[in-house]
C-alpha cells in the first residue's frame, strides 16, 4: 500500500470524524473542501464547520466554494493533483469534471446499505421505515444521486430504542475503518465494484418540521418510529388546546400498546406510567415530553400542575 494524496470534502461532525481517521492514517490529506461559514447562534456570527475547524488545527488548506460548477473552481481542484477525493456529507453537488479530476475519482461514505436509501436522510429514514438493520456503503461516485458502484458495505442492527442520534454515533464508529480499508486497497483493486439494483432503491427524503407533527391517523407503531427517527431534529410534537390557547409539546419517548376502542386522537389515560392516546391502530403511550420553554421531562413531572392538559376523553 502506498501513501495516497487525498482531498477531503465534508461539513458536519459526522464528516469530521472521518477526516480525523484520515489524519491518523498513513495517507496524506492535501486539501479540505467544506461549505462556506454560516451564521449560527443568537448573535448570528459566522461559524466554521466542524470539518474546517479540524482542518485548520492541522494546517490543511481549506477551500469553501459556494458551488463547484464554475470552471475556475474546477481548475483549482484539478491542480491539486489528488489521487482520490473522499466525500462525506459535503452538501454540494459534484459535476462530472470534479468526479473525474482525481486519479481514482471520488469515493463517498453513505449512511445506508445502498441501494436501500439514497438521498439526504438515509439514517433517519431507516428508523422511520422500521428497517431491522442498516450500515454504511463506500461507493465510487458518479453523476447520479447515490447511484455509483458499491465497493464495500458494513452492517449494524437497528435497536428497538434506536434514535437517529444514537444511530449516527454508531455509523460514525463503523464508517471510518471501512473507508480506510477501501483506500488501502485502492491501488490493488482489492474491492470489486458492484452495480446497484435500481429496483431496490428508495429516496430518503429530507425531514421537515411539518412531518414531525404527530398525526393520530397514523398507526401507533409508525408514530413511535417517527419519534425516534426525528430525534435529535426536528423532534416530534403534538398540539392541544389549553384554556383556549394552542400549546405545542415536544415528544421524546413513547411506546406502543395494542388495545384501542376509541377514535384516533382520544386521550385514554394519563398517569405516571404515560399518556395514552388512541391512534388509527393501537395506542401511543408517551413517557417523556417537553412543554414550550422547559426542559424535557418525565410524564410524571409533566402532569404535576398540568393534569388537565391530557384529561381522559379529550380529543387532540
From Swiss-Prot:
EC number: 2.1.2.9
Keyword Mitochondrion attributed: no
Cellular component GO terms held in the UniProt record: cytosol
Enzyme kind, highest EC tier: transferase
InterPro entries, A to Z: Fmt (IPR005794), Formyl_trans_C (IPR005793), Formyl_trans_C_sf (IPR037022), Formyl_transf_N (IPR002376), Formyl_transf_N_sf (IPR036477), Formyl_transferase-like_C_sf (IPR011034), GART_AS (IPR001555), Met-tRNA-FMT_C (IPR044135)
UniProt cross-references to HAMAP family, sorted A to Z: Formyl_trans (MF_00182)
Name this protein carries in UniProt: Methionyl-tRNA formyltransferase
Organism: Actinobacillus pleuropneumoniae serotype 3 (strain JL03)
Amino acid at each position: 500500500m502506498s501513501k495516497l494524496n487525498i482531498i477531503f470534502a465534508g461539513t458536519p461532525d459526522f464528516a469530521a470524524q472521518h477526516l480525523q481517521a484520515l489524519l491518523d492514517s498513513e495517507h496524506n490529506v492535501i486539501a479540505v473542501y467544506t461549505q462556506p461559514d454560516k451564521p449560527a447562534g443568537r448573535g448570528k456570527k459566522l461559524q466554521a464547520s466542524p470539518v474546517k475547524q479540524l482542518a485548520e488545527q492541522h494546517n490543511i488548506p481549506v477551500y469553501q466554494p459556494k458551488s463547484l460548477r464554475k470552471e475556475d473552481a474546477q481548475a483549482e481542484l484539478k491542480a491539486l493533483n489528488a489521487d482520490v477525493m473522499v466525500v462525506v456529507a459535503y452538501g454540494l453537488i459534484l459535476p462530472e469534471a470534479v468526479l473525474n479530476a482525481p486519479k481514482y475519482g471520488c469515493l463517498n461514505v453513505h449512511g445506508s446499505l445502498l441501494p436501500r436509501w439514497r438521498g439526504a436522510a438515509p439514517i433517519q429514514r431507516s428508523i422511520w421505515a422500521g428497517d431491522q438493520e442498516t450500515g454504511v456503503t463506500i461507493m465510487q461516485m458518479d453523476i447520479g444521486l447515490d447511484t455509483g458502484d458499491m465497493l464495500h458495505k458494513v452492517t449494524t442492527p437497528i435497536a428497538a430504542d434506536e434514535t437517529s442520534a444514537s444511530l449516527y454515533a454508531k455509523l460514525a464508529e463503523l464508517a471510518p475503518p471501512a473507508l480506510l480499508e477501501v483506500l488501502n486497497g485502492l491501488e490493488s483493486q482489492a474491492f470489486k465494484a458492484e452495480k446497484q439494483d435500481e429496483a431496490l432503491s428508495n429516496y430518503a427524503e429530507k425531514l421537515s418540521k411539518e412531518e414531525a407533527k404527530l398525526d393520530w391517523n397514523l398507526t401507533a407503531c409508525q408514530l413511535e418510529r417517527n419519534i425516534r427517527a426525528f430525534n435529535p431534529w426536528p423532534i416530534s410534537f403534538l398540539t392541544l388546546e389549553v384554556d383556549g390557547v394552542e400549546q405545542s409539546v415536544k415528544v421524546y419517548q413513547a411506546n406502543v400498546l395494542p388495545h384501542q376502542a376509541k377514535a384516533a386522537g382520544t386521550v385514554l389515560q394519563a398517569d405516571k406510567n404515560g399518556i395514552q392516546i388512541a391512534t388509527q391502530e393501537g395506542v401511543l403511550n408517551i413517557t417523556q415530553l417537553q412543554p414550550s420553554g422547559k426542559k424535557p421531562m418525565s410524564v410524571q413531572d409533566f402532569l404535576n400542575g398540568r393534569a388537565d392538559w391530557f384529561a381522559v376523553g379529550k380529543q387532540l
